Amino acid sequence: MLQAAQQLMRRQGIRRLLVLSGEPDWCREQAQRLAATLPGDWPWVGENPPPGLTALPSRAVRQLLGQERLHAVFDAGQSLDVEALAALCGALRAGSWLLLLTPPWRQWPQLPDGDSLRWSDCPQPITTPHFIHHLQQHLADDSEVTIWRQDEPLTLAALPAREGWQPPDGRPTEEQQAILTALLQAESGVWVLTAARGRGKSTLAGMLVAQSPLTCWITGPSRAATEGAGEWAQGRAQFWAPDALLAQCREGDVSEVGWLLVDEAAAIPAPLLQQLIGYFPRVLLTTTVQGYEGTGRGFLLKFCAGLPSYQALSLQQPMRWAQGDALERITDNALLFNELPAWPADGQAIDYSQAEQRELCADPQRLARFYALLSSAHYRTSPLDLRRLMDAPGMHFGLAQAGQEVVGAVWLAEEGGLSAELAHDVWAGRRRPRGNLVAQSLAAHGGQWWAPTLRSRRITRIATLPALRRQGIARQLVERQRSQAQGLDFLSVSFGYTEPLWRFWQSCGFELVRIGSKPEASSGCYTAMAILPLSEQGEALRHAAHKHLARDWPWLRQRIELTLAIPGDDGDTSLGEEDWRELAGFAFAHRPLEASLGALQRLLLASSLPLSALRGHLQRRQSPAACVEQAGVSGQKALLRYWRHETAQALEQLNAQHCRYWRDWAQSLQ
């Protein structure tokens, strides 16, 4: 049955989805039997494939980027990794069947999903009824998806009539040729090519290499991701891993290289990409419009907006399959990959509202618009975000709407409410429970051990429609969250620090309480955290956390490349009770050195002991490697123990009784 349908699918250039819904043994047995009737690659994504089929763990499916397979099985019986599912769909060539194995149809929404451990911040798998109902609805509504339930006969959905498909013949399409002609004539510049999966981005890059008289280098998130370009390049382009390429640019001569081609550029850390671009006269960046490699429109808005100039290019016509492919359609619809058309601002009044998960998920059109707006503003969006939005506990949403259009969106996550005992363990570095990003960070790195006991909501994402930016919509969304909050101590936000972003949060009433010590890999920005107090306890936390940051800032800024003034430091370098607590946490518990930096610097000013290892690193700025050698210890773990030992010595020498008190507190489980 599948074989006859597959011949027509190949002629039409499409792929199809067959859902097998039933008990695990039945699903495996039917999948094995069906695979035996059709020659193909048949990777089995999931655990325990039947004999003769090759297991491919879901975490390894990304390795198929830029590659092609014929037919596949995706076992979603215990765990549904939608990132892996999307990646697998993108790797299947025309004429392929994808078999999706699911639990019994009616039971599925009530069953725990093992994949939820990756995104729900829960210690055990949770049920995910909103997303599963959403997926089931899309599967049932698509006329070309076949759903085969256990104890029912297999009846394939009919294939609509389509014109015959002409697979690529090695020559560029009209779209590709127009872009190639422009690139081959280029003297210099940056070009950004965005397209959906299977549109021939990598093929075009390879054709450029093959036809250009210039030396071309290729980089990408992995060598496998650039295989498509490499095949067309006929061995003329050298592949470099991004970090190795940057090292080569810094240390060697790259003046003979005429083109740098960056495949799936949105998957490469922005600061690294920014530096690479500056070394080459011509750069072609390719990135996927929507999906698991990054969001193309968000990439254009965020990364490319920071370039002096660039030219945007796009490909619309599929290459690996025909226009209107059945598998691409169901994947795009179910995972909300379709970017919504630009909305013309028409002067409609804007209404603000709150929405809880159940309410938002019950309105598919509003959900799609809400998610599309957030995706367009954050190019690191992945299908995990959709799953978290729909089913993770503690999610809350605010919307700004003009008619039916969502023009502003804010997404918040509950944090805090931990017991004092657990909060103390977080402060001491003994435990790091899932979630609670800002609340835990203020305890683990900001010195406020009690912060996780307070109740708060963290703004995880906020976005407004580009046509309506700078009209106060985002600020109004935040104000609505502040005014309608009940039983909360504060709102928080964690963001990559830039002056414009901080000005926005400051205008909303937030105050800085923490700056990370290292730039984020994805953005190159330092993580900043800020809070907006809503209660007396929240105000006390704001005051204490900001004072802690301001007091430590003179030493922190020596390690952080930010031109930022943080008022509030009174210049007092004597050891206070908060310093004793911090130092005891470092000396007698497991707090990291970076979290205790200011207190350690003040300790060195107060102590008359040599403390050679601490002074070498903190006052003379010796590297950890130099400190290891000077201290005669066996490595960085031993060096950390030595630093802790020196700190304990200094505390004991300053005030033995006080030292014992704070040692007992740091080691207690109160």
Regions found by a protein language model. Name each.
Residues G394-L412:
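Conserved beta-hairpin
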